[in-house]
Design a protein with these regions (language model features):
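Short, compositionally biased P/S/T/A/G/V-rich stretches that sit at domain boundaries
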Residues: 383-407, 437, 492
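Active-site-adjacent mobile loop/cap segments within catalytic or ligand-binding domains
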Residues: 277-289, 294-295, 325-391
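A short, glycine/acidic-enriched catalytic loop
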Residues: 168-178, 281-307
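Short edge beta-strands and adjacent turn/loop segments
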Residues: 54-84
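Low-complexity "stalk/linker" and mucin-like segments enriched in Ser/Thr/Pro/Ala/Gly
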Residues: 398-400, 431-451
Length: 492
């Protein structure tokens, strides 16, 4: 398998990547610099994409031969997957986004594990983008100007039950390979985020799905498990343009396609300032995991919002015990979801973790992870809305301090970052010249307007030196690296 023009034909099943072929250490550098190793990895990626397409076409009853080729732009950290003639998704099935976007995630994972740095992945179909085939349907609507003072948000949490035609069977839209159903789990994340946005950002929050536990009359399922389409049908029965865009479609799952569009249609109807969509991700490979945030390929102006949210999620999630190494992407990714294309306001999609990975499933069911991840989403949005940059929390250096014996002295502290109040400054002992004479302290600060200052005291009659380590910790558990300084008790 040499050269970059290897284009496998869809004929096989099974994953071509497994743990032994993933690069590490010196192999990563080799793949990036060795043309032969690079070509080998690209060929393996092409085989993996072809294998996934085979299974997808088998499941849809449309198996046929389709070539697949891949090009990677190392400079722009991007990948282009090109399908040959015979595969062209259409409006029925929402342009296969529930197949193509998970495929992109797995290809990104395998590329990075093999030593190729990839962030954005796009697709061509016989040499053209989907927008070239469907220019009217996939056009991004004109975007409203972002208001300096924002007042409202739509939180859209996952999918929910839809009805299949013609038998009218009711099914969840997402699989649950490890027993965690995204369609029932994500609304609790929406509840968490709604409370945080209302409390910390001061916005009115609307929800795309009902949270009622009463039964939906037609399905007999709880309203809170139904998709947005049926909730909006109940709210606006006359607005079929909002929730019933494909009444004449022959597709069995046409109401799934309508549901994807109903959520941003509702955001446009409300005129909210931002749309935040929450999901869990899934992959054919149980190895793929972690937190991702997406903006639409044709709405690059939404990338700063997506990056800010991802940055804040990383900061707060990794501040929690047990989650210091939780995988979170460094940069948001461009994709072509319908959910964040149709909205006329900034719209991003948060894939909190993978419901197909055992470690991620454990995290998704942990209230600590749920709270931390949604605090990150809210904080990232709030910083973006205020024009602030997400940056690490860090204490400024603290100079050594002399304090007269039997007196005290206030010492001001500076920091960078955007901590959540109340704050605590924790002073721990590194050394003390007189055993038992020095005491660790914690000082709490509730008012973000007042400057930070700690009081250092020398209460005894004798002189001496204590070396202290200071840590600034915020209400979300985010802490600075320790800063060491000395306090000397001196005679006047």
């Amino acid at each position: 398998m040499k050269g970059l023009k290897f284009a496998p034909v869809v004929v096989a099943c099974g994953l071509f990547f497994a743990s032994p072929v993933l690069a590490s250490g010196a192999q990563v550098e080799k793949v990036a610099e060795d043309p032969g190793a690079y070509a080998e990895v690209v060929a393996l990626l092409e085989r993996e994409a072809a294998s996934q397409l085979t299974r997808h076409l088998q499941q849809t009853g449309e198996l046929r031969q389709v070539s697949v080729s891949i090009r990677i732009d190392m400079k722009n950290r991007s990948m282009m997957v090109s399908f040959g003639p015979g595969y062209l998704p259409g409006p029925e099935g929402s342009y296969d986004e529930l197949f193509l976007i998970p495929m992109a995630s797995s290809l990104r994972f395998y590329a990075e594990k093999s030593g190729l740095d990839v962030n954005d992945i796009d697709f061509l179909f016989d040499g053209k983008t989907l927008e070239e085939y469907y220019p009217e349907d996939l056009a991004v609507p004109p975007q409203v100007q972002v208001r300096s003072t924002q007042t409202s948000a739509l939180v859209s949490a996952s999918h929910g039950y839809i009805s299949l035609h013609p038998g009218r069977e009711w099914e969840f839209q997402r699989p649950a390979p490890l027993g965690v159903q995204e369609d029932t789990l994500s609304p609790a994340y929406g509840d968490e985020l709604q409370g945080l946005i209302e409390q910390r950002s001061g916005l009115t929050v609307h929800r795309a799905r009902s949270r009622s536990t009463e039964l939906h009359p037609e399905s007999g399922k709880p309203w809170e498990h139904m998709s947005s389409r049926y909730h909006l049908k109940a709210l606006f029965p006359e607005r079929t343009d909002m929730w019933n865009e494909f009444p004449n479609s022959p597709a069995s799952a046409r109401e799934k396609d309508e549901d994807i569009r109903a959520r941003p249609n509702y955001a446009n109807h409300l005129g909210v300032d931002v749309m935040l969509s929450l999901h869990t991700n899934g992959s054919e490979s149980a190895s793929v995991r972690g937190t991702e945030v997406y903006y639409h390929q044709e709405k690059p102006q939404d990338k700063p919002l997506a990056d800010s949210i991802l940055c804040a999620m990383q900061e707060i999630i990794r501040a929690q015990p047990g989650y210091q190494d939780f995988p979170i992407r460094e940069s948001s990714s461009a994709a072509r979801h319908g959910e964040n294309r149709i909205g006329t306001m900034p719209s991003i999609i948060v894939e909190t973790a993978y419901h197909s990975n055992p470690d991620d499933v454990a995290a998704l069911q942990d209230p600590v992870f749920r709270a931390a991840s949604m605090k990150g989403v809210e904080k990232g949005y709030r910083l973006w809305a205020a024009g602030k940059t997400c940056e690490p929390l860090a204490l400024h250096p603290i100079p050594d301090v002399d304090v007269l014996v039997q007196s005290s002295r206030d010492v001001g502290l500076g920091y960078t970052g955007n901590p959540q109040y109340p704050l605590a400054v924790e002073l721990s002992l590194t050394s003390c010249s007189e055993a038992g004479a020095c005491t660790p302290t914690t000082t709490t600060f509730d008012d973000p307007v007042k400057p930070l200052a700690i009081t250092l005291a020398c209460n005894g009659p004798g002189s001496g030196v204590v070396r202290l380590t200071a840590v600034l910790r915020d209400a979300d558990g985010v802490a600075t690296a320790p800063v060491e300084f000395a306090q000397a008790c001196v005679r006047g």
